């Protein structure tokens, strides 16, 4: 009995040794040498895999940089420090990366009176009862549940896309927390209304609206939308504001952040501070700001 056990153990041990030798030989024969710079590039990146660079993850971007398929400086989360470190590894010079944050171009926060009637913000033409997703909602009834076809739908698709908890839904409109935002713009990629754009944090004056409708149409759909009146353009001392397609626009190469435009805007959609500090993300229903969905 003991001899049989020893024989079995010996056979198994021999097979293990043979297989080990075969695997060791195979690893030598089929070994593919990797560039040590790839690991170094990966170490420079934050590892968030946010996709803001256009690649599936940090590893994909690092490999693309190594192969010369992607420029250095596309990692918004890593910022300038990351870009300079990657440039040093690749032996090239990288331009300074300017930090940017996301801006949601909508001022249609819905305000209600004690009776539940809408008194300010984007008007709701129908209550949406479907899947809580902005893309899905935007396809209902032509332009979604809002009267304004340019406004934020407020179902939090951008909130779900953000890996940094930098976006909240406040009174039916997405708001960005500048302190948490890294500028990866993953939120912009999923917004069906294309409302989210990158801006420099130092820019204290922004136009929080994206409506291209004529003034009368905008007013029917939202009490706080841009009507293209041009008052902001007239008061700007630097000629930094133009009105194109019924929407005021700021040329930041001319803007000195004086804020005069905000003082004359009849709709109060020109903000002196483009990003608000918010609490925990809360998604409200379209018609009732107190009801979470």
Residues of each region from the PLM?
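Cys/His-clustered metal-coordination modules, chiefly Zn-binding fingers
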Residues: 213-214, 240-247
């Amino acid at each position: 009995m003991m001899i049989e056990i020893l024989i079995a153990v010996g056979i198994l041990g021999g097979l293990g040794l043979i297989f080990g030798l075969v695997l060791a030989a195979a690893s030598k024969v089929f070994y593919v040498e990797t560039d040590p710079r790839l690991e170094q590039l990966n170490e420079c990146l934050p590892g968030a895999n946010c996709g803001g660079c256009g690649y599936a993850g940090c590893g994909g971007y690092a490999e693309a940089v190594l192969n010369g398929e992607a420029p250095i400086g596309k990692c918004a989360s890593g910022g300038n420090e990351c870009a300079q470190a990657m440039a040093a590894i690749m032996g090239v010079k990288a331009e300074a990366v300017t930090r940017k944050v996301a801006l949601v171009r909508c001022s249609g926060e819905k305000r209600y009176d004690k009776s539940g009637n809408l008194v300010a913000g984007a008007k709701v033409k129908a209550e949406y009862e479907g899947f809580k997703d902005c893309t899905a909602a935007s396809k209902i009834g032509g332009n979604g549940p809002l009267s304004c076809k340019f406004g934020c739908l407020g179902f939090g698709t951008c909130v779900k896309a953000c890996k940094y908890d930098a976006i909240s839904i406040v009174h039916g409109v997405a708001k960005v927390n500048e302190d948490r935002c890294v500028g990866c713009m993953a939120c912009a990629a999923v917004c069906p209304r294309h409302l989210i754009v990158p801006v420099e944090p130092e820019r204290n004056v922004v136009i929080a609206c994206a409506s291209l409708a004529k003034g009368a149409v905008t007013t029917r759909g939202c009490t706080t939308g841009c009507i293209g009146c041009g008052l902001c353009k007239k008061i700007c001392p630097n000629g930094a504001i133009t009105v194109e397609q019924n929407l005021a626009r700021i040329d930041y190469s001319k803007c000195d952040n004086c804020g005069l435009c905000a003082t004359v805007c009849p709709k109060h959609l020109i903000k002196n501070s483009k990003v608000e500090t918010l609490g925990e993300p809360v998604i409200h229903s379209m018609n009732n700001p107190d009801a979470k969905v």
